[in-house]
Design a protein with these regions (language model features):
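Intrinsically disordered, low-complexity terminal regions
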Residues: 1-222
Length: 222
């Protein structure tokens, strides 16, 4: 089975933008705990700093290890949260989200077009959602629901979803008509992982759920 890239490799375009039209926030250059907003620039928050909300329109956002921020938001760009970072929420439209080890997100994590990967020891207090992308959780906890429409879902090494897993069907009629040869999505849950709520399937899904995994009721709406 092909593995989704880990957070350290998921958002490489963000790292490449450092120094190339990227706004670098450092303690020596800027006052801490202020909101940071840009339009056509990526944003890099140095390790251990505390800032307010962070937003851009066309650019990625990267928080280094142990950085703290409020709401993190971009439209066209990826988000990378380094180990032990803390944020209120993380949201993008066109871009992936990579979450390192022992990160705490007090709210939700969401993207429309992009993968989401969460490393060991991290906690997302509310929902995690993508429409066109895969979700990978490794020994991490989701306090709300997990939802995708067009991407595989993988729970490994003791990952826990406190709410429901929802695999929606948001394909248009054109895609449904001509997708006869497309492979079904995959839902993988290993023996150490758990889903406290229900699993709702609104489209064909290939299930790889270990018999030892703790999961709730499986409901097929197809």
């Amino acid at each position: 089975m092909a593995r989704l890239q880990s957070p350290s490799r998921l958002i490489t375009p963000v790292a490449l933008l450092i120094g190339l039209g990227c706004y670098v926030f450092t303690a020596s250059a800027d006052a801490t705990e202020e909101d940071i907003s840009r339009v056509n620039r990526s944003i890099f928050i140095a390790a251990g700093l505390t800032v307010g909300d962070v937003s851009t329109v066309n650019g990625g956002i990267r928080l280094s290890a142990a950085a703290i921020a409020g709401e993190v938001h971009t439209v066209n760009g990826s988000i990378e949260l380094g180990a032990r970072a803390r944020v209120d929420s993380a949201e993008t439209v066109n871009g992936g989200i990579g979450i390192g080890e022992e990160v705490i997100v007090n709210g939700a994590v969401s993207t429309v077009n992009g993968n989401i990967a969460v490393d060991a020891g991290s906690e997302i207090e509310r929902n995690i959602e993508t429409i066109n992308g895969e979700i990978l959780l490794e020994n991490s906890r989701i306090g709300g629901d997990l939802e995708t429409a067009n991407g595989d879902v993988t729970l490994l090494q003791g990952a826990t979803v406190e709410g429901d897993i929802i695999i929606a069907d948001q394909r248009g009629w054109w895609n449904k008509l001509f997708s006869g040869n497309s492979r079904p999505l995959k839902l993988v849950i290993d023996e150490k992982s758990s889903v406290k709520g229900r699993i709702h399937l609104y489209r064909e899904v290939e299930l790889h759920i270990d018999p030892a995994a703790e999961v709730g009721e499986l409901i097929e709406h197809v």
